[in-house]
Amino acid sequence: MEGTNNTTGWTHFDSTSNRTSKSFDEEVKLSYQVVTSFLLGALILCSIFGNACVVAAIALERSLQNVANYLIGSLAVTDLMVSVLVLPMAALYQVLNRWTLGQIPCDIFISLDMLCCTSSILHLCVIALDRYWAITEPIDYMKKRTPRRAAVLISVTWLVGFSISIPPMLIMRSQPSSMAEDRANSKQCKITQDPWYTIYSTFGAFYIPLTLMLVLYGRIFKAARFRIRRTVRKTEKKKVSDTCLALSPAMFHRKTPGDAHGKSWKRSVEPRPLPNVNGAVKHAGEGESLDIIEVQSNSRCNLPLPNTPGTVPLFENRHEKATETKRKIALARERKTVKTLGIIMGTFILCWLPFFIVALVMPFCQESCFMPHWLKDVINWLGYSNSLLNPIIYAYFNKDFQSAFKKIIKCHFCRA
C-alpha cells in the first residue's frame, strides 16, 4: 500500500570534478536498480507461484473442497491479485525512483493497492472468525458452515475494501487542492494525506481487524486448551475401576514352613473399591492360595505388610506412567497451538504494523517527523511480502495441501 512517498534518498559526495561525481552517482544508482530488480522480481514470482499453487490445489483436489479451504483459496486469489496487479507497478516505481505512467494509472494503482491489500487483511480476519466459530460451537456451526456462508463472508471483505479504496480515486482526486498537488508532483504517486481519511482508512483496513484477530485467537487458544485438558480428564475417568482388596492381618493364616507351596495366605478377603484400578484376580477356594494375575492402578495403594496394622498392598500402580505420558501429550498440543497462533499473528503484525504506524502518524507530523526514504521503502515492501507468506502459513503447513502440491509438481493431475 502506497502510504508514503516511495523515493530513495542517495548521498551525493562533493568533488572537484562534476563528471566524477555524476559518474559515481550513476554507478551507485545502476547497482541499486540491478539488485532491487532482482530481489523484487524474485519476491513477485514466488508470490505468484505460491498463491497459484494454493488455488490449483483446491480446484483440483476434491478432499480440499470445504468451507475452511474455500476461505484460504479466496485469500490466495486476493494475494494473487496483489502479486499480479499491484506489485509489478510498485516494483517499477521503486526501481526507477519516480512515477512514469501518468496520473490516471497512478489513481488506478493506488485504488488496486488499497483494495487488494485491505481485502487480504480482512480475509485473515474472516479465517480467524471461521476458526473461532468452529472450535467454540462445533455442533451448531457445522450446520451453518456452508459455501453460501463463506461466499457472504468473502463478499463482506471486498465490500469493506471497496469502501476504503474508492474514496481516494473518486472523491479526494476531484478536490482542486488535490489536482494542484498532482500537477506539482507529477513524478510521485502517493495516497492523499488528508488526516480524517487517514484515520478512517488505517483503522478500517488494519487496526480494527488486528484487534478482532487478537481477541479471536486468544479465545481460540483458551477453548483449545480447555478441550485438550477435558479430553485427558475424560480418558482417565473412562478407565475401568476395579477393586483394591484391603486385607487385615487378622484375616490371614500362615501355612507351616513345611507346606509344599511355602508361605501363603488363607482366603479371607474384604473388597473395598478404590478409584482407577484395573486388574484381574483369581479367587481361590477355601484353604487355597490367592493368586494375583495382573493389577493396574492410577493411584498407588500404599498398604503395609501383613505383620503391621492396617491394610495390605496387593496392587501396584501401573497407569501412572501412562497418565503422565498423556499429560505430556496434552502439553505438547498446547505448545503446538501456541506456536501456530504465534506464527499467524506474529507474521501478520511484523508485516503490517510498521506500515500502518507510519501511515497513521506521518500525515499529522509531516514537518516535524523525519524518516529515511530507504526505511520507508523497507516498511512498504514488508507489508507487500505478507502476500508471499500467507500461502506458506495457511496452506503449505497443512498436510492435505502438501500432498496436493506434490501431485501438482509431479503433474499427476495432468496425467489424470
UniProtKB/Swiss-Prot annotation:
It is a multi-pass membrane protein. A motif (DRY motif) lies at residues 130-132. G-protein coupled receptor activity is regulated by lipids: phosphatidylinositol 4-phosphate increases HTR1A-mediated activity. The keyword Membrane applies. The chain crosses the membrane at residues 36-56, 71-95, 105-129, 150-171, 196-218, 341-364, 373-397. Disulfide bonds join C106-C189. 1D-myo-inositol 4-phosphate binds at K339, T340, G346, F397, N398, K399. It holds the Pfam family 7tm_1. One of its GO terms (biological process) is adenylate cyclase-inhibiting serotonin receptor signaling pathway. Serotonin binds at D113, C117. One of its GO terms (molecular function) is G protein-coupled serotonin receptor activity. It is found in: Cell membrane. Glycans are attached at N5, N6, N18. GO terms for cellular component: plasma membrane. PROSITE patterns: G_PROTEIN_RECEP_F1_1 (PS00237), G_PROTEIN_RECEP_F1_2 (PS50262). Its main location: membrane. Keywords: Behavior, Cell membrane, Disulfide bond, G-protein coupled receptor, Glycoprotein, Membrane, Receptor, Transducer, Transmembrane, Transmembrane helix. Residues 57-70, 130-149, 219-340, 398-416 are cytoplasmic. Residues 1-35, 96-104, 172-195, 365-372 are extracellular. A motif (NPxxY motif) lies at residues 390-394. Belongs to the G-protein coupled receptor 1 family. 5-hydroxytryptamine receptor subfamily. G-protein coupled receptor for 5-hydroxytryptamine (serotonin). Also functions as a receptor for various drugs and psychoactive substances. Ligand binding causes a conformation change that triggers signaling via guanine nucleotide-binding proteins (G proteins) and modulates the activity of downstream effectors, such as adenylate cyclase. This is 5-hydroxytryptamine receptor 1A-beta. It comes from Takifugu rubripes (Japanese pufferfish). The gene is htr1a-B.
